[in-house]
Amino acid sequence: GGGAANKNDDFTFKVTITGIDGTYSTNVAGKTITNGTETEFTLRHGETFVVKNLPENASYTVVETDKKGYQKTEVSVNKEANQTSDTAEGTIRMDGENTVDYTNTKTVPSPTGIALEILPFAVLFLAAIAGGVVFFRRKRG
């Protein structure tokens, strides 16, 4: 319904990741990700959903499915320019950020005109360190 932004609103999202084997953990207890399976989660104001140790070139789709009456949703993938959309898609990279930032905006009547209320959310994909092993070669003196 109407009214001002509520920082306790739970907004519902779904994430699907492909190009992965096995099960991947998240920062939510009991919530795991498997290849091609849609996983639902909720976020409140300022919260972040994290998927851990994803391999390079895994593909993801994130969709906000319940906006709680907010009129506008913007999404930014890897800190690039905002797009007005409920859906974000991308590929895991080793050489940079793997983030999806959502911003929901609600226009509320105000005695002084129009007030915009904005709630930010983030989805963070943590790439696995390539191979997870670093080799150091000792120079022979």
Outline where the language-model segments fall.
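Solvent-exposed loop/turn and edge beta-strand elements of beta-rich ligand-binding domains
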Residues: 1-141
